[in-house]
Amino acid sequence: MSNLLVLNSSANTGESVSRILIDEAVNQILTAAPGTDVVRRDLGANPVPHLTTANLAGVRGTPSTSEELAARALSDELIAELKAAGTVIIAAPMYNFSVPTSLRSWFDFVLRAGETFKYSEAGPEGLLKGKKVVVLTSRGGLYSEGPAAAADFQEPYLRHLLGFVGITDVTFIHAEKIGFGPEARAAAITGAKGQIAKVAQTFSTVAA
């Protein structure tokens, strides 16, 4: 079994639904495929810095200052983790209809020309083909269908970013309406855990 990269992005380190779900997913996968190597990156507790004038050249240029060199070293580290992973699990709560800025910053540091994608005469080409990603979302309302679906800037955004680097095997598991009260929250978690169990079964097949 190849490496599993686990990305938490919730700023809530307490009873975060997305953290509950990602812990469930990791436990289920390790049960199905005990030999899996897990690399954890908690972007909520230890966020990747935002791109600024001081560090931009470290990711999108030629680094020279200490800030730029530090940004390049972090970018290299994050990209190495991603390249080594056969599967990535992302816990992504919906913040203001999109993703936490900590997750956005992670993408800013790993989407690097020549490393995770390249430009050609035909346009950009992703260099990370063959990987699998499972995205676990938590949402206060219902955005997968109905009138609020037009306000879902989370799933389309993540699908596009992942597709840009060549990752098209992406599964989304949504825990929705968690803001509708305790019963709705519990039902959303239970439903998402059921979907996680089905996804985890595929890992035992791969491991075999």
UniProtKB/Swiss-Prot annotation:
Reaction(s) this enzyme catalyzes, per UniProt: 2 a quinone + NADH + H(+) = 2 a 1,4-benzosemiquinone + NAD(+); N,N-dimethyl-1,4-phenylenediamine + anthranilate + 2 NAD(+) = 2-(4-dimethylaminophenyl)diazenylbenzoate + 2 NADH + 2 H(+)
Signal peptide feature range: none
InterPro entries given in the database record: Flavodoxin_fold (IPR003680), Flavoprotein-like_sf (IPR029039), FMN-dep_NADH:Q_OxRdtase_AzoR1 (IPR050104), NADH:quinone_OxRdtase_FMN_depd (IPR023048)
Keyword check for NAD: yes
The keyword Oxidoreductase is annotated on this UniProt entry: yes
UniProt similarity note: Belongs to the azoreductase type 1 family.
Protein name (record): FMN-dependent NADH:quinone oxidoreductase
Lineage: Bacteria, Pseudomonadati, Pseudomonadota, Alphaproteobacteria, Hyphomonadales
